């Protein structure tokens, strides 16, 4: 009898160990919890629906939670859908059987979706005319993202999220006036903050990069700060004077081979209009031609231009060498330094030393 008892105990231990090993390694597949998953998604928004395949469950021994993962699901609103790579979350077993919120966090990894597909989904999710008009400026592109959604145990409707990912091969046409091509960047987004990094784009055949642009939501406004850089490129600066609503009549209409480093700041108000635009720019140029009376016999070479612009002022400081067009007047031993300051609505002042 005792022998049979030992055998039964050993058999129970073996079966329990086998089940535990199965749950902690391979896990098992079921669709029994699909309704629970959809219920959690509905807490985000009742319009949202998930199209799920079988869900894989694995047991975490340390936390005593089921690690849940489903592959290739879709998230839908009416006819609009987003293709996902996976959805992952943990189910607290004790909370589940005590009728408490068993899921505190959901992790979502998307497949690559078109931005047009995502725009339609967002507009269906929460229609906003101003946002729709902005999204219509995006003509093409692809996006891939990861999302972390955190649920409050005591307030299920109070959730936090963190979104990160990348945008590639995007084209934006602002009001049919300014076109930006081959846009790519990485992003990090939460409720009140957007951070864009590793930005590359082409504007009017000018290659532009940025280490970082940050967008902060303050009340009903947005504050934007960032940095833009251009490599040495042939640029006609006067061509863009309309963008800053300033006539740069000091400069020649000829293109300039230059590079630039720009720090900018502006606000977007609750009507999506730009306010308080400010920019600080350093431009390095090879040769600079002006419309001044000196232009017929000298030109500026290997210099820097420092620009400080906001709606009240435009300050330009120039630090450069200058050369005579007639080379016999040039002295290779001299510095030929030229310094100038230009202020909007004030007189132009300059000084030189050679």
Which role does the model predict for each range below?
Residues 18-120, 132-142, 146-156, 194, ...:
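Terminal hydrophobic membrane-targeting helix
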């Amino acid at each position: 009898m005792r022998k049979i008892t030992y055998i039964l105990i050993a058999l129970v231990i073996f079966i329990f160990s086998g089940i535990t090993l199965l749950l902690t390694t391979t896990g098992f597949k079921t669709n029994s919890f699909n309704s629970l998953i959809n219920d959690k998604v509905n807490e985000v928004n009742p319009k949202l629906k998930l199209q799920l395949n079988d869900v894989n469950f694995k047991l975490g021994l340390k936390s005593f939670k089921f690690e849940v993962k489903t592959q290739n699901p879709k998230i839908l609103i009416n006819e609009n859908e987003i293709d996902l790579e996976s959805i992952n979350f943990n189910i607290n077993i004790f909370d589940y059987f005590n009728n408490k919120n068993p899921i505190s966090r959901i992790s979502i990894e998307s497949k690559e979706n078109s931005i047009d597909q995502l725009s339609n989904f967002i507009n269906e999710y929460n229609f906003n005319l101003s946002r729709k008009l902005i999204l219509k400026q995006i003509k093409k592109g692809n996006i891939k993202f990861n999302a972390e959604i955190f649920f409050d145990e005591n307030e299920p409707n109070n959730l936090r999220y963190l979104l990160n990912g990348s945008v590639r091969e995007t084209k934006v046409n602002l009001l049919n006036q300014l076109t930006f091509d081959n846009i790519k960047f990485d992003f990090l987004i939460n409720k009140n903050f957007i951070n864009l990094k590793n930005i590359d784009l082409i504007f009017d055949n000018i290659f532009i990069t940025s280490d970082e642009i940050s967008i902060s939501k303050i009340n009903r406004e947005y504050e934007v700060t960032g940095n833009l850089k251009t490599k040495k490129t042939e640029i006609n600066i006067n061509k863009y004077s309309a963008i800053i609503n300033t006539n740069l009549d000091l400069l020649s209409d000829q293109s300039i081979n230059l590079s630039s480093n720009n720090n900018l700041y502006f606000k977007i108000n609750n009507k999506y209009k730009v306010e308080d635009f400010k920019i600080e720019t350093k431009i390095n140029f090879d040769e600079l031609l002006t419309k001044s009376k000196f232009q017929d016999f000298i030109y500026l070479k290997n210099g820097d231009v420092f620009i400080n612009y906001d709606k009240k002022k435009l300050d330009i400081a120039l630090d450069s060498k200058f050369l005579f067009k007639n080379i016999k007047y040039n002295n290779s031993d001299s510095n030929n330094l030229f310094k100038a300051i230009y202020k909007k609505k004030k007189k132009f002042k300059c000084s030189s030393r050679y």
